[in-house]
């Protein structure tokens, strides 16, 4: 009996041991499978990450090479176009010189050289040959011994006059497309000849990332794991634990095992995060991987030494282009006028071919084109004006990210400016290839970047700390040395003027809040004096006092501080346009809203021009043009009285005020 009992106990012990060994075997097999799966999963992640990065770098390489090619092609096209114009002019002038009975050509130069013909130091009279004009005439012309080099070559119509038998002077009539080359024969000479040089940085950008979509491939599963997961009762480690728990309830000596495996639930995610299809043969995970953008490609335009020497013998040209604006009779004006500082008169040019109202912005690309963006009547419209040809064209883009369909379509059904367009916004040109559109209606929350080479839009990702992108009628200044945009004042959704000043860092795509304005305003005129590192804010509207301002606020970029300039001279005119200081702060001719589009700063002369304005309180329209030399503004308490000159630049040919845009072009 005792032997049977001992045998039974022995059998129970063996049975217990066998069950434990079976569990041990199962755990070993499962652990081996886990090791394999961990290896396979890690290997897959490594391969996926490298494949993702390699694919991204491949796409990035294609993107950068495409950018490189587009920039080169656009630059070459401009040079080739100007070269072709020069060839055409050479042919025209040769024909005119060979037809003295029909045309009289007079070149007047203070440096001498005869009359009745075109004289170059490298050759005698007669026509210019294209085949020798560069290799022969140019080399001689640029040589130090050239007698002609000492005398400026006057490109304007005062030095090169084409007179037919009817003695019609093109200077007395408005410039038209058909006569543009008759009146400015040598204007093409002021188009710079420059080469393009790229700056390539082969590093990942710290503050600029992109999201890449990762679709993980089916996870390789061994026959053991497949049988365990799909065909057996063990659907997960929880099932294995459950079986062991049932056994351990009757066996006290299994506590150590149970306590050492409390983390098995962590592996449940390996299965819960998977998508198992009906066939049970595919497991996929989907996710995005954030990668730092690799590489940064910038370019700069460098004027050739040969052209610099040629240009040194040409007179500088300086013109103001006034586009649009509202007339006193209440109608919108779609004309464009050009004021030539040398000639001292306004000339009518080709009218705007599209209704844009007055709430658009305009930017000069530094070469030969002016771009107009938006407007309340056509908020998605983009126009491009060719200065040399006096021609307009409507830009139609093919952006894939334009998902709105609000009727603002181009001729081919393309929406030009994304997000329903812009008006009452601000825009700045970075001096290279991008124009940035910020703020405005319809309550725009994104910064748009327009590439003038590809003529495509993209959106910046950064968000403003003070929601300046929701404002309208802001002032905007671009500062080249730190590649930043300064956003000044503006009007919010409740029509209240704000006092915010923000700096948008383009390279880092980030905003920084700076010291606020002393007096909040919107619709002010702003400009940047790069010599003294000041930002000036002129006039504008203050909603708190419900009045237009006639003060000048100045921001010092070096110490992040503002000052309101005060005039310590008595004035006969009593005006309540200041911030509470009485007559001492009346520094503008009148309280007015100027807007960034109606103020021009000539940095070379340090002269500011205000071209018209509007007082939205008194409803007074201002069509005078005011000029001020800011070199007299030395400190906050002005030692010299500010004297604005009225209509030193004569009034417009078509009297205008409020809105539109005015652009200074210097070459």
From Swiss-Prot:
SUPFAM superfamilies: Galactose oxidase, central domain, Kelch motif. Kelch repeats lie at residues 319-366, 369-412, 434-480, 484-531, 534-582, 607-654. Residues 58-98 form a coiled coil. Keywords: Coiled coil, Kelch repeat, Repeat. It holds the Pfam family Beta-prop_ATRN-LZTR1. Residues 248-281 are annotated as: Disordered. This is Kelch repeat-containing protein DDB_G0274267. PANTHER family: RING-TYPE DOMAIN-CONTAINING PROTEIN. The keyword Plastid does not apply. InterPro entries: Beta-prop_ATRN-MKLN-like, Gal_Oxase/kelch_b-propeller, Kelch-typ_b-propeller, Kelch_1, Kelch_domain_containing_8. It comes from Dictyostelium discoideum.
